[in-house]
Regions:
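N-terminal low-complexity, acidic/polar interaction/targeting segments
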Residues: 1-183
Length: 183
């Protein structure tokens, strides 16, 4: 769980269609493909495509739950832009989706509709508080050290893609670097 002291609300609450993710976490600035099979998730993605293409992606606490409710979702997720939906061939109804994470958001609650075909969440985008000036030098040193450790890893790792190495080395903020490496 993210410590609430390190986050600040950056906008007013808004409502978005929601996809509960199993065993997957999406971060801001991350581009990812994954498959969706649950009817509510497919409907949420279709609703997003019919609207502004934005969807709230949030991990569910227990991956064995087939139809999670809001209390079974984590508090922090990501607002993402749906880039592409592709129906998978075969008998299953799975859809392959491509999304790009935009910003972190806090789940405030669910928006229940009588005939709701998908999860809809009331969310508020959040941003990290800036690093205090007295910790700035320490923060820079940690980023520098993390990059040095990554460079050491690249030397022993086989077939490390150049774009990943470049991406890590271009990050200067601790949060951005952590999101990039985690993603």
């Amino acid at each position: 769980m993210i410590d609430k002291e390190f986050l600040t609300f950056s906008e007013k609450p808004r409502e978005l269609p929601t996809v509960a993710l199993r065993g997957l976490v999406v971060f801001p600035d991350m581009f990812i493909h994954f498959e969706v099979g649950r009817e509510k998730s497919i409907n949420a993605l279709k609703e997003a495509m019919d609207g502004g293409q934005e969807v709230f992606l949030v991990a569910q606490r227990d991956v064995s739950v087939d139809d999670p409710d809001y209390d079974e979702l984590y508090d922090i997720g990501v607002i993402a832009k749906v880039k592409q939906l592709i129906r998978m061939p075969g008998k299953n109804t799975n859809i392959r989706v491509a999304v790009e994470g935009i910003a972190r958001a806090r789940l405030i609650g669910g928006v229940a509709g009588k005939n709701s075909k998908c999860l809809r969440s009331l969310i508020v985008p959040v941003s990290e508080l800036p690093v205090a000036e007295e910790l700035r030098d320490y923060s820079r040193a940690l980023v520098r050290h993390a990059k040095e450790l990554f460079a050491d890893y690249v030397e022993v790792a086989s077939q490390m893609p150049v774009d990943i190495v470049t991406g890590v080395m271009q990050k200067s903020e601790p949060g951005e670097l952590a999101d990039y490496v985690a993603g």
